[in-house]
């Protein structure tokens, strides 16, 4: 049996490496072709370039304004992720730890909002923002990402916060922490797995 298991293990390993090569091959060819001229890409799309050239990268940076696009993506992603993580975790904490009458209703409304596809409200949103002269702005895009990402984030944080023992917060309050200090010093650090999931 041992030789058979060893053969099966080797076959599985070979299959996984073959699958990895298949998945990585498009990225490899894109990278290789980025060093070729247009004529060489058409004539020899799968081979190595005859002359390694950085002209395509220079063109991308100069004509396509790649640096500006990259900075925009970086700023929008950074502030969107930070905003979603902070505001959604605070919202979920309020839903879990307070006994307001409409907490469950508001939570289910937020969860139901995840069912609404972005395509269904994309055109009305563009019309509204266009009427307010808010188009072509980083901050309005961040605001939209906050709105669309918060529902799922609240759903994730809600389940995780319910599993945190209430005694930890009560002990912190006895030591003199306010509700905000309890959240940021006790609860939020315990939410690292959920926060990393959202960031990724």
Where in this protein do the model-derived segments appear?
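A structural signal for multi-pass alpha-helical bundles of membrane permease subunits
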Residues: 2-200
């Amino acid at each position: 049996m041992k030789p058979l298991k060893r053969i099966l293990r080797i076959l599985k390993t070979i299959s996984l490496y073959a699958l990895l090569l298949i998945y990585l091959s498009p990225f490899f060819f894109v990278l290789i072709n980025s060093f070729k001229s247009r004529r060489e890409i058409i004539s020899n799309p799968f081979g190595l370039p005859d002359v390694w050239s950085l002209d395509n990268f220079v063109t991308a940076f100069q004509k396509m304004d790649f640096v500006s696009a990259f900075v925009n993506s970086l700023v929008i992603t950074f502030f969107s992720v930070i905003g979603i993580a902070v505001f959604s975790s605070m919202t979920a904490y309020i839903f879990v730890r307070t006994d307001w009458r409409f907490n469950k209703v508001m939570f289910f409304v937020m969860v139901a909002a995840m069912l609404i596809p972005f395509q269904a409200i994309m055109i009305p949103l563009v019309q509204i923002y266009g009427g307010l002269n808010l188009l072509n702005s980083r901050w309005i895009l961040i605001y939209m990402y906050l709105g669309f990402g918060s529902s799922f984030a609240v759903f994730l944080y809600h389940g995780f916060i319910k599993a945190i023992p209430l005694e930890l917060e009560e002990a912190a309050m006895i030591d003199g922490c306010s509700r905000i200090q309890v959240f940021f010093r006790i609860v939020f650090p315990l939410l690292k797995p959920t926060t990393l999931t959202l960031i990724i």
